[in-house]
């Protein structure tokens, strides 16, 4: 009825009110009620501005639950129902989309490795279980590949690299980065799919030298690495899909990915972490970030 009243207000200078009410199937009492409501001062004006600001500052990816937690952190208590209504009125909509997954499986080239993780993505402390995978981005300037490693403890991106080719150097450089940041005496399980990158000598040698434990999904079984693929899905929904990448160079696009992951680790609210980001969660528990 509110939308109808707005349209009728816009047209009543040209057409008679009774005709408009009849055309929009709206009772006169309902119309005058909506007018009175719209003419009242907006008691949520400051909250409306705050919600819009939070939404825009966080890449337009926060739904009403994360907005609720972000407001709570700023000392503002507002019901989720009111937040949902304000977001609808302000047209603050999170865009979602899905694309096909990049696959690097080229057949068996080394002996089969046990699936130690076995879809148990829970970890009691940082660097206990790490998940890794590669995903592909295609923009007008070309293709870029992201290799990332996710910590099951809190979803933190423990390491990542980007490159124009999904080769051994891409994943090995990322693994070197993670190994360099491991706490002393830490030997996590590293779980991957059966992509060729994770069965080449360079990867296996690095794993063995660092005392890391290999775990691999079954062939063609996406749920076995669902937590890592889930991160890629969030990244693409929140950063990639729904935007125009015309005239964006691969270097600039690479920087966009870096900025997103830094924001994801340090700022992005996770509902499963009580409204904290992965870095904030570690600091809250007394772990090194």
Predicted features and spans:
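Charged, often Cys/His-bearing segments associated with DNA-binding zinc-finger transcription factors
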Residues: 1-19, 23
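Basic, flexible linker segments flanking DNA-binding modules
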Residues: 2-5, 21, 28-125, 221, ...
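Mobile genetic element proteins and their domesticated derivatives, centered on retroelements
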Residues: 21-24, 31, 51, 67, ...
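Conserved, non-catalytic sequence blocks in retroelement Pol enzymes and Pol-derived host proteins
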Residues: 40, 57, 77, 122, ...
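RNase H-like two-metal-ion nuclease catalytic core shared by retroviral integrases
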Residues: 103-107, 192-194, 200-204, 216-236, ...
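An active-site-proximal beta-strand-loop segment
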Residues: 119-158, 164-165
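Active-site beta-loop-alpha junctions of metal-dependent nucleic acid enzymes
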Residues: 138, 161-183
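C-terminal domain-tail junction helix/linker
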Residues: 208-212, 236-289
């Amino acid at each position: 009825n509110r939308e109808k009243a707005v349209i009728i207000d816009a047209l009543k200078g040209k057409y008679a009110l009774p005709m408009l009410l009849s055309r929009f199937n709206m009772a006169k009492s309902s119309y005058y009620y909506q007018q009175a409501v719209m003419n009242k001062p907006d008691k949520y004006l400051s909250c409306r501005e705050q919600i819009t600001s939070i939404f825009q500052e966080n890449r337009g990816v926060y739904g009403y639950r994360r907005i609720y937690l972000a407001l709570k952190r700023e000392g503002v208590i507002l019901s989720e129902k009111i937040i949902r209504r304000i977001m609808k009125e302000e047209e603050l909509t999170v865009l979602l989309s899905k694309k096909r997954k990049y696959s690097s499986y080229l057949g068996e080239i080394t002996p089969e490795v046990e699936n130690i993780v076995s879809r148990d993505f829970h970890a009691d402390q940082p660097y206990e279980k790490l998940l890794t995978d590669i995903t592909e981005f295609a923009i007008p300037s070309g293709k870029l590949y992201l290799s990332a490693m996710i910590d099951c403890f809190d979803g933190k991106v423990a390491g990542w690299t980007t490159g124009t080719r999904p080769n051994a150097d891409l994943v090995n450089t990322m693994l070197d980065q993670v190994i360099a940041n491991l706490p002393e005496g830490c030997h996590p399980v590293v779980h991957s799919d059966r992509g060729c990158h994770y069965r080449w000598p360079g990867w296996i040698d690095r794993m063995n030298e660092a005392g890391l434990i290999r775990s691999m999904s079954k062939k063609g079984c996406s749920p076995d690495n669902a937590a890592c693929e889930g991160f890629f899905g969030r990244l693409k929904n929140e950063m990639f899909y729904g935007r125009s990448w015309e005239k964006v160079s691969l270097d600039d696009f690479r920087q966009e990915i870096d900025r997103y992951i830094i924001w994801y680790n340090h700022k992005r609210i996770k509902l499963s972490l009580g409204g904290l980001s992965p870095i904030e969660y570690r600091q809250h528990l007394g772990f090194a970030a």
